[in-house]
From Swiss-Prot:
Protein name: Serine acetyltransferase
InterPro entries xrefs: Hexapep, Hexapep_transf_CS, LbH_SAT, Ser_AcTrfase_N_sf, Ser_O-AcTrfase, Serine_acetyltransferase, Trimer_LpxA-like_sf
Phylogenetic placement of the source organism: Bacteria, Bacillati, Actinomycetota, Actinomycetes, Mycobacteriales
SUPFAM superfamilies xref list: Trimeric LpxA-like enzymes
Family named by the database record: Belongs to the transferase hexapeptide repeat family.
Length: 229
């Protein structure tokens, strides 16, 4: 347990530039507290103390705003940033080094027993407000964009955005570590493509063209910003 807790502290410091010291993480990070509370609740759950496990999970929910069923499996160095509103269901499995932002739901589909929640691979990043629903697999090193609704399996190293979630690219690890904070700008790319086609049609038809060229500020990728948070 202590080894896992040290790993959770290290994960918070590595992935959040606002976490300067381990002491601040220990006392001021509800996402870390939620993971710790779940580790205790899951330990009780595995040993058959189901009522105590549910009580521990409920206390953690009241304290942190994070609702993790004690039956869920949470890997090493999982970091829940900003914490509030995260829901993880009973049969969910979360791999190692996963980052989860506020408002994320790893939810079930239907009322049938058995496996009904997602399995999230190692080093996945799930953006704010995303919903991953059903017994699907999210492949290792994938990124789920903010507010995406994912209901189909995701291959490794994929980037998923939209409602319903669509794979629109590959996640590229950054040189300094596994976290590449870039997300494709689908609106900008679509607008750029549309304007290009209109310009070509006007050129073919000899119709009037507006003075100058109207284009989005940058097509394809927004650089230097983290749109997951």
């Amino acid at each position: 347990m202590l080894t896992a807790m040290r790993g959770d502290i290290r994960a918070a410091r590595e992935r959040d530039p606002a976490a300067p010291t381990a002491l601040e993480v220990i006392f001021c990070y509800p996402g870390v507290h939620a993971v710790w509370g779940h580790r205790l609740a899951h330990w009780l759950w595995q040993r058959g103390a189901r009522l105590l496990a549910r009580a521990a999970a409920e206390f953690t929910r009241i304290l942190t705003g994070v609702d993790i069923h004690p039956g869920a499996v949470i890997g090493a160095r999982v970091f829940i940033d900003h914490a509030t509103g995260v829901v993880i269901g009973e049969t969910a499995e979360v791999g190692d080094d996963v980052t989860i932002y506020h408002g994320v739901t790893l939810g079930g589909s239907g009322m049938v027993g058995g496996k009904r929640h997602p399995t999230v691979g190692d080093r996945v990043i799930i953006g704010a407000g995303a919903k991953v629903l059903g017994p699907i697999k999210i492949g290792e090193d994938s990124r789920i964009g903010a507010n995406a609704v994912v209901v189909k399996p995701v291959p490794p190293s994929a980037v998923v955005v939209g409602v319903p979630g669509q794979v629109i690219g590959q996640s590229q690890p950054s040189p300094g570590g596994p976290f590449d904070w870039r997300l494709p700008d689908l609106v900008g790319a679509s607008l750029d493509s549309l304007l290009t086609r209109v310009a070509r049609l006007e050129a073919l038809g000899g119709g009037p063209q507006a003075a100058g060229v109207i284009r989005p500020p940058e097509a394809g990728i927004w650089h230097g910003e983290d749109f997951s948070i």
